Each structure stands twice: as structure tokens, then as C-alpha cells.
A protein has these predicted regions:
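Basic, glycine/lysine-rich polyanion-binding surfaces/domains
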Residues: 1-195
């Protein structure tokens, strides 16, 4: 293995120490050390999420922003086939990133926010996707956020549980988000995602 490849698999999310402390079996994934399972096992985890809810650290995914006016981010429509003008603030769309031949390179979620767009990119492809986006968007108007965590909560009781911790979350409709405070920290919650 090359020295560069070893470095890439040494990346850790902010929750790495927590995962290890609760017995997470850590494996390399998309350049990060990520938990693949916990001591109770995959089946028990799966059944718990299906009946209740589960928390997933997906901080290895790309959290990418495009800053600027609508005029500055509209060129993204050349490679992402959605109508960005039709998005309301805090509304998300699941879409694809097209290659130069009009085929699909990847899928992603785009959210319109005040001052631009937030995009969640797949972990394994994020650097390729950013390079493609930079073909139509000025790189000085973009940022890959390496200092943010991304947590997914899934399951039939996810909204109920989260609303007890962050009142108001239950008012969000699918593919919409909002800013909230949690322990005096600014957070952004969307009711979106797919698996």
C-alpha cells in the first residue's frame, strides 16, 4: 500500500473516539475509519432501526457549499438536471450529477439556503464530484466543509425522538430543513435522505 493510501484511510470523523469507546468495529470506508457494526451485531441493530430509530455517523460524506447569488449558482443546472429557481429556501432535491456525455456520474442532494446552495456528496466520489462542479462554478465560490459532522437518524420513531431533543423538528416536511439550536450550538436539520 502506498504512503498516500495509508494516509487517506487514517481519516476519522469527530465521533471516531465515541465509536471505539462503545465497541464499534472500525473498518476503512471512503478513506475514513468508520464503524461497520457494534457488539450486539448487525441483525439486532437492523431490527432496532426498523422498529424504533438508529443514529448513523455519515460525516465522511461531502458537505459542500456554493456561495453567491442565484445568477452565480445557476450554471450548476448544466450538470445537475433540476430547476434550481423553483427551490424554496431550505428545500432539498435528490438529483444526479451528469458527466460530459449526459450520463450519470453520481447522485446527490442539493438544498437551497440563504446565500447559496448546500450539497451532500457521496463519500467515495466527493473529490471527483467537486472537480466536476468546478467546471461550471467558480471554485472561489465553493467550500468543502471538513469541520462539520453529519448525523442521520432513521426509523419510524426518528421524528418523535428528535422532536423531544430539538422541539420543532416535527414541523419539517419531507425534503425541507431549518436552523435549530442544540446545547447553544447552531445546527441545521433536514427531513431528507435515502438509503
Amino acid at each position: 500500500m502506498s504512503q498516500n493510501a495509508e494516509k487517506i484511510t487514517d481519516l476519522k470523523t469527530a465521533l471516531y473516539d465515541f465509536h471505539v469507546s462503545v465497541g464499534g468495529k472500525m473498518v476503512p470506508f471512503a478513506g475514513y475509519q468508520m464503524p461497520v457494526q457494534y457488539p450486539e451485531g448487525i441483525m439486532k441493530e437492523h431490527l432496532h432501526v426498523r422498529a424504533n430509530a438508529g443514529i448513523f455517523d455519515v460525516s465522511h460524506m461531502g458537505q459542500f457549499s456554493i456561495y453567491g447569488t442565484e445568477e452565480e449558482y445557476l450554471p450548476l443546472e448544466k450538470i445537475v438536471p433540476i430547476d434550481l429557481k423553483s427551490l424554496n429556501n431550505n428545500q432539498s432535491k435528490y438529483t444526479v450529477l451528469m458527466n460530459k456525455d449526459g450520463g450519470i456520474d453520481d447522485d446527490l442532494i442539493v438544498t437551497k439556503v440563504e446565500g447559496g446552495l448546500n450539497i451532500v456528496l457521496n463519500a467515495a466520489c466527493k473529490h471527483h464530484d467537486i472537480k466536476r462542479i468546478h467546471e461550471v462554478i467558480d471554485p472561489s465560490k465553493t467550500k468543502l466543509h471538513k469541520d462539520l459532522s453529519l448525523i442521520a437518524i432513521q426509523g419510524p420513531k426518528a421524528v418523535e425522538i428528535l422532536d423531544n431533543i430539538i422541539p420543532g423538528v416535527s414541523a419539517l416536511t419531507f425534503m425541507n430543513g431549518s436552523k435549530f439550536k442544540l446545547n447553544n450550538e447552531d445546527i441545521y436539520v433536514t427531513r431528507s435522505g435515502y438509503t
